[in-house]
């Protein structure tokens, strides 16, 4: 059982590292999760790789018996990459580019993204392939989250046409017959005539839109598989996982298909986010946990468990004393075998300032610290039974194509 925190030492003065790791150890942790947003630190300029920062963090963590979950940093591309290859940025439906500064702003069909992501992942794997402290690799971060699962750029248009060309064996008439394009004079003479299903009068052909949903999913799954393959080519025994966000059934990506390329699934469990005035109900939280367990039909990790209020620019409900601890227990009861709290300490600047941590930004140990400490102390006693699989008596069957089809054509106001 791995018990830990998500630690971002790059946000803090180097002089704080030793005290941080001492306190993380006192908290009851045996692992830390690092590096998932550290691309610029590891490659400050194109081709100039420098792993010294995280080497030092790992070395000092190992001295305290802490193990490492290492994240590939592809969720946040560096500024120099966006400047050199602006086409790497994804596009909104109206054709405007997503600008550098957020996260997941890249296009999943960008050849440049594959090139540069491949370089940093390969360099990381080569550098850390003999590091025994690394217990797992996390590829990217929350793939498909926050509308990053949709892009309408020229690269996606050409890739979508290639996808359809392959699906229909280059036979455009087969596509016409399948889609029923003869109505509304939608018939195509060539795959290069096929548009992206952006805004139009009324709506696009539903079969075209369904294939677009399938294509969007495949684009993200392919990118995840690319990273897993790279890691395992260099580190054959690497344990590879991904931290899935909530709301998986509403994404433009089939997380069950993505999970086939992982050794196990992990989940970022947020009963509260942003301006929510109340947390999710216990049954909604349970559904999310069961969904993650069902992705590979096996136990899972929680890579982000909250301990304070959360949000990018606004917060709502703040967990009451022992409420976040209760959510952590609920996770363990539904198949979680290792858990990491997001995050060790809240930030004083930069993105996610309102994502509060185990410690607040003033670095003072208060109720939240001792709440996590007590949870870790208690849950260790159940490490062995929590490793056993959960055998459900009831199943909920879902299908990505069916969910997408209902998004496209709701059919009736009675089907809600």
Predicted segments with their positions:
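The substrate-binding groove and active-site-proximal loops of carbohydrate-active enzymes
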Residues: 2-14, 35-54, 99-118, 143-149, ...
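Short, solvent-exposed turn/loop segments enriched in Gly/Ser/Thr/Pro and often Arg
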Residues: 8-10, 35-38, 71-80, 135-144, ...
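Carbohydrate-binding surfaces of carbohydrate-active enzymes
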Residues: 191-194, 263, 267-416
């Amino acid at each position: 059982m791995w018990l830990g925190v998500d630690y971002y030492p790059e946000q803090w003065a180097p002089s704080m590292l030793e005290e941080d790791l001492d306190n993380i150890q006192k908290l009851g942790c045996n692992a830390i999760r690092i590096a998932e947003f550290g691309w610029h630190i590891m490659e400050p300029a194109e081709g100039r790789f420098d792993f010294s920062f995280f080497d030092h963090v790992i070395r000092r963590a190992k001295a305290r018996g802490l193990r490492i979950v290492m994240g590939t940093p592809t969720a946040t591309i560096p500024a120099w990459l966006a400047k050199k290859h602006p086409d790497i940025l994804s596009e909104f439906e109206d054709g405007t580019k997503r600008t550098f500064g957020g996260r997941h702003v890249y296009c999943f069909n960008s050849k440049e993204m594959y090139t540069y992501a491949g370089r940093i992942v390969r360099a990381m794997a080569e550098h850390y392939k003999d590091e025994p402290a690394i217990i797992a690799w996390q590829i990217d971060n929350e793939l498909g989250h926050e509308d990053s699962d949709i892009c309408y750029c020229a690269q996606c248009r050409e890739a979508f046409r290639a996808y359809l060309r392959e699906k229909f064996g280059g036979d455009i008439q087969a596509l016409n017959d399948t889609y029923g394009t003869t109505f509304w004079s939608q018939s195509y003479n060539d795959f290069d005539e096929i548009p992206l299903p952006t805004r139009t009068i009324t709506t696009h052909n539903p079969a075209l839109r369904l294939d677009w949903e399938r294509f969007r999913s495949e684009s993200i799954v392919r990118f995840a598989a690319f990273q897993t393959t790279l890691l395992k080519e260099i580190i054959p025994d690497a344990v590879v996982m991904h931290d899935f966000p909530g709301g998986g059934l509403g994404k433009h990506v089939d997380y069950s298909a993505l999970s086939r390329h992982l050794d196990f699934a992990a989940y970022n469990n947020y009963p509260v986010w942003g301006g929510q005035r109340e947390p999710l109900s216990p049954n909604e939280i349970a559904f999310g946990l069961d969904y993650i367990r069902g992705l590979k039909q096996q136990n899972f990790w929680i890579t982000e468990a909250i301990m304070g209020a959360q949000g990018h620019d606004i917060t709502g409900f703040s967990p009451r004393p022992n409420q976040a601890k209760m959510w952590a227990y609920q996770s363990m009861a539904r198949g979680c075998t290792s858990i990491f709290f997001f995050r060790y300490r809240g930030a004083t600047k930069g993105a996610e300032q309102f994502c509060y941590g185990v410690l607040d930004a003033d670095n003072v140990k208060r109720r939240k610290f001792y709440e996590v400490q007590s949870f870790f102390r208690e849950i260790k006693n159940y490490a062995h039974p929590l490793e056993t699989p959960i055998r459900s008596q009831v199943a909920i069957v879902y299908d990505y194509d069916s969910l997408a089809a209902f998004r496209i054509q709701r059919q009736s106001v009675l089907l809600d």
